[in-house]
Amino acid sequence: AEFLSLHTIFDETNPDLSVSSTKAMVGHCLGAAGAIEAVFAIKALTENKIPPTIGYSEEDIEALGEKAGTFDFMPNTMKEKDLHYVMSNSFAFGGSNASIIFSKEPGNVKETENDEKVYITGLGIVSPLGNGVANYIDKVNAQIKPEATSVHANVGKEDYDKYGLKMAFYRKLDKFSLMQVISGLEALQEAGIEVTEENAEELGMIVGTGDGPLTTVYEFQEHISENGTTAGSAFNFPNTVYNAAGGYLSIKTGMRGYNVTVTNGAQSGMSSLCYAYNEIKQNRGKAMLATGTDENSEVMEKLYAKLGKVAGDVKQAYAGGDGFVLADGSTSIALENETYAASHNAKKYAEVCGYAMTHEGVAYGDVAGTEKGLMNAIVDAAAMAGITLDQIDAVYGFANGADEVDTLERHVYEEIFAGKVPVHQVRDYTGEGRAASSALSVAHAALTLSGDLATRQNAYYVTTEEVTKEVVDTSAYKYVLATSCAIGGSYAAVILKKVA
């Protein structure tokens, strides 16, 4: 694919092109490969020396000469050349590609942030409550709660038929990717975004996941450990990479814009929204999908149980337990700038008007992290939104029943809100779905601001000394805060505003 692309682009414009592959020397280092390639590119540029592509036999060189045309593929020999611009390329399964151009001279690329508002215009939900936004609204309004300590979302033929997935496509995907594809397609449909040849490169996505396709990775590794490396399945191997889900969704929809997978623990779903918002504000896309997806399986149950984080019985937020209800699911959120949203009369669930992501390093194994890290995220998000903390009408938090997580949240909320602001917890309904839950907190907040959820909802008032649960009226909410936390001390906060 790279060979053909180079000829297509450069045959007429740059016939003296030199091409080198560092993988011939260092092997394929998977996720590190792109970074290693970039280091080689920079060294080549600064020293005017192009490293060789090693490993060619005489027969290889003869065959290459017949196809290379005027390009120099650097077979086995380093060459000196006066270099001004060097391109580093990288690709991954599912059609994800990246290119960086390095130059000795200062470039003319300027980052300019636009002043357009960014709206949430579509949602997609796959959860243990069932699939679809309408189903989620019904179940939450009916106060349906988990009845087991490990709960699961499911996708099946009804979902595939609804979104036109053919067997030849969906049989290739593992559960992680299937959940992501279904929620992503619903969000696009809800937003009324139609992918065309004209707009495909202006529509992108950021997939957030804490654990990714870990079940598939485990099963693949277990199989080759027991049966030898030759027993590895070429059919299943593409699903072992974290960005496979985003690649499959891109293939299905035809979206060819920015496509990145964010892996930053349980708050990755909210991080994806922060990054997607920034891409739109920096004029790198008119619309983006921000998603959070994580899987529950027998493998995940064993791993989280080994950490001592699966509850012994069903726990709600602030219950003082030692673990949480383990869950899975996928939440996708469509974001659009105001011009693009207006061009197709999109529904506006809420405006995204501020965010922050922080990290406060903690000791290995520390689940909750530090109060300072969460505090900084909340303060910075409010500052970006241009509001004061006392303008926040409600919080959509991350308490999950595990005492060390819930206590951190209680301390910070008391410090900022003094127990006067209602706190909503989506994990009470769906369990701890990690990245899916952090994105769902934002989706739930948006559904509240838009009036799609019932205006009378359960919420907590929390201090370090006391927690009370009350039914609150959400109809007057104007600004709301959503927060998330991940093992290791990573935090995210997002401010949403009701659309007038």
Q: Could you describe each region identified by the protein language model?
A:
Residues 1-2, 6, 38, 95, ...:
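Conserved small-residue
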Residues 106-150, 309-387, 393-394, 495-500:
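Condensing-enzyme catalytic core mediating Claisen C-C bond formation in acyl metabolism
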Residues 29-50, 67-75, 100-102, 181-193, ...:
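Active-site-proximal alpha-helical scaffold in enzymes
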